[in-house]
Design a protein with these regions (language model features):
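Second-shell loop/turn segments in exported
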Residues: 3-12, 78-86, 105, 144-146
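Residue-level recognition of short, well-ordered coil/turn positions
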Residues: 30-31, 61, 125, 148
Length: 196
């Protein structure tokens, strides 16, 4: 799981609290598979932190990491929950099922999202970004007054259910492939942002 280290009281930053709570939960409730929590910096200047981390993984580590779950914007009271899947389409269906099972409205699409998950997909690790759109995220209006505990809880619940479902699966249900309809936009994205 990954997220960016941002200012601490805004939709851009509360993902850190969600990651900490997930970390605490899985410390007390271990999964069948190991789970790694990663905080990355410099997302806003070209995903520099996550790109460095992903590119510095050893070949053995790359083989062991089967999925990256990235949490981006979260907590806006008025907003929509989204998942962008940089992996095979079956992960879209898993997310739709888990969201429906948990009573969480979720828009799911396969593709790329300009967030840390793209750095992991770029090195061949399937990835998904969970985020919530709403007013003010990543702007000068990005303040704590936009946050609400119920909206934060939805992102936490979805990340928890997805991690538990996949982390405890007898056979991991998502293949290690990055499909071409994801790979090409990913290559285009990194070509456009190179040197920025």
């Amino acid at each position: 799981m990954s997220g960016t280290f941002d200012r601490l009281k805004s939709p851009s930053s509360v993902k850190q609290y969600i990651l900490l709570e997930l970390c605490r939960f899985f410390k007390d409730n271990p999964l069948r598979r190991p789970c790694r929590f990663v905080w990355c910096g410099a997302e806003e200047i070209g995903l520099e932190g996550s790109r460095h981390y992903a590119r510095s993984l050893s070949p053995d580590s790359l083989r062991q990491i089967v999925l990256n779950i990235n949490i981006d914007l979260a907590g806006q009271l008025i907003g929509v929950n989204h998942a962008v899947v940089s992996a095979e389409e079956s992960l879209c269906h898993i997310l739709q099922f888990l969201a429906a099972h948990s009573g969480i409205g979720l828009t799911v699409r396969q593709g790329i999202f300009p967030s840390d998950a793209s750095s992991f997909a770029d090195v061949g690790i399937p990835a998904v970004t969970l985020y919530r759109t709403g007013v003010g995220g990543h702007s000068r209006k990005d303040t704590a007054c936009l946050l609400h505990p119920l909206a934060l809880q939805k992102t936490y619940d979805l990340a928890l259910e997805l991690t538990r479902y996949l982390g405890d699966s007898m056979v991991f249900p998502v293949s290690r492939a990055i499909p071409e309809n994801v790979r090409q936009p990913l290559n285009d994205y990194f070509a456009r942002t190179a040197g920025s």
